[in-house]
Curated annotation (Swiss-Prot):
It holds the Pfam family Kazal_2. Gene3D superfamilies: 3.30.60.30, EF-hand, Immunoglobulins, YVTN repeat-like/Quinoprotein amine dehydrogenase. The gene is Fstl5. It comes from Mus musculus. It is found in: Secreted. This is Follistatin-related protein 5.
Length: 847
């Protein structure tokens, strides 16, 4: 008997010695494997060892496991109380990995675990010869599954670093693909391009992965990432499992140009493709758009396209798209917004006597710049051009010298661009003075009556001046009564020896009314243009100093200081400003429940092609922020924080070409002035500094020119803004004039161009600059301006006022005079003396 068991024991040792593991190489070492086979049931080794041990170590007279066979999953134990041999469920099985499925649907690491479970559950569990249980159950949660895959990548990465001598801190995304390629090559032991369950089993055994992966195993790769459910993993499925993204972008689509017409909707489609492409991220001016909940860019679509629901000029510019996490593959969309032409002609009608000169002008704006043409009575005038009939300023002006009766007609200006066509008619009547027609009468009344006048508010009341002949049309004295009231225009103050007026700011309301602030009387006067009389006084908060007419909403905004020391500044609004109704002010909603911190406000001015402005900004004293307001509801919307840029805003300018705000910042404690900030109105985000440009910004009416004035440096910088919203450097002008104010005037020699005139706060000259060429000229000897202490209402102690879209005249005051400049000839037209402190000037008229 003993010999028999000795033989069995020796055979057991031989069997154990023969069951070893294949030699591992560095990292994953398995190069081949034996296919997984199903073995017949036999007594587990741990149970055999127990029986042998019981035989070799006799346990006394009461019980022995020598002849006790307990069956699979159980072993023999001696009951400590009865000292008899009994069968009990095995405490544990020998660690080895040979996974099988039980008939109870559970997954087991080996046969022994099946039998042990049957014993513990007291039910019959057989081995099922398929792998269905490998893919059932939900013990492997998503977070654990992700951790398992990360661990596999880390293991492979260690080998990759060792073998390839790579830097472990290099880009994870770029390194992931070779790691997964190597891992798949190792898993695919038979190199057939597919990984099956047997190969996964061998990897688990080889790497002892079953000890480290908690509730997840390699079989979960087949469970969750076998995309076509063929119970094999191909390389593409491996890429999917480990999120190896292979993206492609055709070379000819790296830059895409898209054009849309204002008012339409637009779709920008990202051409980046690839299996498992992550969500597409869109940026504008390096600001991510996807999570901003924008009103007009609010649906990115399942395909990652960018949708703009209603295109405006603010949307023009560059947009970039890329797959999330893969910013190195990006597409740039150059988005151009086309705007149909909008035309204005001047004059609408005119009468001329034979032998004089007539001029018909046409101004057109659109994107791109429109091409102009002229018809006379419906027939193209180009074939009829001569010395007597010429086109000037790139076709924007018809010039007729020595007019004849046959020149009478309807002259139609036509503007065309890619987005559309517009036209308008300017009528010319050639008649001698003896045949005065109704058209002639109407034209003369329009030209010499209430329109095309400068209104000057000065110490001795209000003067209405016709600029061509420098004639007074009306003088409203301080003692004149308001129409229908007993109040005087400027009541005599007790401390004044003579009755005089104090004015601050004034605005033109649709050429119908002029609103003008009287800061020492805490009120606004309304001047009726038709009757040239003061018709109403509107009470305001103390010391109203700044007015702005919001044409989009027919509102006049009023900034009052509260006192000369600016102790309690407030904002008020007069609604229905152009209506023939009694007017009053209403307060705006306080920002942060604080009325007394308002230092200034900014509302963009509408243009010929952009007629509606929806938002404005409030500036608080010494605060690094812009407070956005809804002009329609007069309520606060949000705050744009400028602290990170260390900018306390002083003044703003706006261009509709790309929708940029340019912000000049207050000098810091060292006296250094930070560069201008640029804010994108689409996202309300700071997109950076405007290069190294500093100073007060001004933007031309067409939005194309940004002129920045830095008095400290004596520098005027001109930048050009393209129809794609690009900001380009143009030229610099060095001057010691100390610019007080700027006025833009359309060029008389070039269509679609502007000139600027700059008045001086200290000197007697006016600066002229032709923006298209950089040509500079000085108009000299305009006498000294008001002293700054005599004009406390703003920093512009010498105002300069243009005369509208077609006007050739500008007005600027000195201390005791008015100067009218001829912008067409770039020279002084006339001086009007005995006008003291006439620094409040308004133009009324179409010209």
């Amino acid at each position: 008997m003993f010999r028999c068991w000795s033989a069995i024991l020796i055979l057991g040792f031989i069997f154990l010695a023969s069951e070893g593991r294949p030699t591992k190489e560095s990292g994953y070492g398995l190069k081949s494997y034996q296919p997984l086979t199903r073995l017949r049931h036999k007594q587990e080794k741990s149970q055999e060892s127990s029986r042998i041990k019981e035989f070799l170590i006799h346990d006394g007279p009461f019980g022995s496991c020598e002849n006790k066979y307990c069956g699979l999953g159980r072993h023999c134990v001696i009951n400590r109380e009865t000292r008899h041999a009994e069968c009990a469920c095995m405490d544990l099985c020998k660690q080895h990995y040979k996974p099988v499925c039980g008939s109870d649907g559970e997954f087991y690491e080996n046969h022994c675990e099946v039998h042990r479970a049957a014993c513990l559950k007291k039910q019959k569990i057989t081995i099922v010869h398929n792998e269905d249980c490998f893919f059932e159950g939900d013990n492997c949660m998503a977070i654990e599954y992700s951790k398992m895959k990360s661990m596999l990548l880390d293991l492979q990465n260690q080998k990759y670093i060792t073998q390839e001598n790579e830097n472990p801190n290099s880009d994870d995304i770029s390194r992931k693909k070779p790691l997964v390629d190597q891992m798949f090559k190792y898993f695919d032991a038979d190199s057939n391009g597919l990984v099956d369950i047997n190969e996964l089993t061998q990897v688990i055994k080889q790497e002892e992965l079953n000890k480290d992966l908690s509730d997840c195993t390699l079989y979960d790769l087949l469970k969750y990432d076998d995309f076509n459910a063929d119970k094999h993993l191909a390389l593409e499925e491996f890429y999917r499992a480990f999120q190896v993204i292979q993206l492609s972008l055709p070379e000819d689509q790296r830059v895409s140009i898209t054009a849309a017409t204002v008012g339409q909707s637009a779709v920008l489609s990202c051409a980046i493709v690839g299996t498992l492409r992550p969500p597409i991220i869109w940026k504008r001016n390096n600001i991510v758009l996807n999570n901003l909940d924008l009103e007009d860019i609010n649906d990115f679509g399942d395909d990652g396209s960018l949708y703009i629901t209603k295109v405006t000029t603010v949307h023009m510019g560059n947009y970039t798209c890329y797959a999330d996490g893969y910013e190195n593959v990006r597409q740039t969309h150059i988005f151009q917004v086309n705007v149909p032409p909008v035309i204005r002609v001047y004059p609408e009608s005119q009468a001329r006597e034979p032998g004089v000169t007539a001029s018909l002008r046409c101004h057109a704006e659109g994107i791109p710049d429109p091409q102009l043409g002229w018809l006379k009575n419906g027939i193209d005038i180009t074939p009829k051009l001569s010395k007597q009939l010429t086109l000037q300023a790139n076709g924007s002006e018809v010039h007729i010298s020595n007019v004849r009766y046959e020149d009478t007609g309807a002259y139609t200006c036509i503007a065309r661009n890619e987005a559309g066509v517009d036209e308008d008619i300017s009528s010319l009547f050639v008649e001698d003075s003896a045949r005065k027609t109704l058209a002639n009468i109407l034209w003369r009344e329009e030209g010499l009556g209430i329109g095309n006048m400068f209104y000057v508010f000065y110490e001795d009341g209000i003067k209405v001046i016709q600029p061509t002949e420098c004639e007074f049309q009306r003088h409203i004295k301080p003692s004149e009564k308001l129409l229908g009231y007993q109040d005087e225009v400027c009541p005599k103050a007790e401390e004044d020896e003579v009755q005089r007026c104090v004015w601050a700011s004034a605005v033109n309301v649709k050429d119908k009314f002029i609103y003008v602030a009287q800061p020492t009387l805490d009120r606004i006067l309304i001047v009726d243009v038709q009757s040239q009389k003061v018709v109403q006084a509107v009470s305001t908060d103390p010391v109203p100093v700044k007015l702005h007419y919001d044409k989009s909403h027919d509102q006049v905004w009023v900034l009052s200081w509260g006192s000369m020391e600016k102790t309690s500044p407030t904002l008020q609004v007069i609604t229905l400003a152009s209506g023939n109704v009694p007017h009053h002010t209403i307060h705006t909603q306080p920002v942060g429940k604080q009325f007394d911190r308002v230092d200034d406000f900014f509302i963009p001015t509408p243009t010929l092609i952009i007629t509606h402005m929806r938002f404005g900004f409030i500036l608080h004293k010494d605060e690094s922020a812009l407070h956005k307001i809804d002009l329609e509801t007069m309520s606060y919307i949000k705050t744009i924080n400028l602290k990170d840029s260390r900018c306390i805003p002083l003044s703003l300018a706006y261009t509709h070409l790309g929708g940029y705000y340019f912000i000049s910042c207050k000098a810091d404690i060292t006296g250094a002035t930070p560069p201008q900030l640029v804010v994108d109105s689409v996202t309300d985000s700071i997109i950076g500094f405007n290069s190294d440009v500093t100073g007060t910004p001004y933007v031309s009416p067409d939005g194309h020119y940004l002129v920045s004035v830095n008095d400290v440096k004596g520098l005027v910088r001109v930048q050009y803004i393209t129809i794609r919203g690009e900001i380009l450097d143009a030229f610099d002008i060095h001057t010691n004039l100390h610019i007080s104010d700027l006025a833009f005037q359309p060029s008389f020699t070039e269509a679609h161009q502007y000139n600027i005139y700059g008045s001086s706060s200290q000197q007697t000259d006016v600066l002229f600059v032709e923006l298209s060429s950089g040509k500079v000229k000085m108009i000299k000897s305009l006498k000294e301006p008001l002293k700054t202490e005599d004009w406390p209402w703003s920093q512009k102690n010498r105002h300069i006022q243009g005369s509208g879209l077609f006007g050739q005249y500008l007005m600027t005051p000195s201390k005791d005079s008015l100067f009218i400049l001829d912008g067409r000839l770039n020279k002084l037209n006339c001086e009007i003396t005995e006008v003291q402190k006439g620094n409040t000037v308004v133009w009324v008229g179409d010209a």
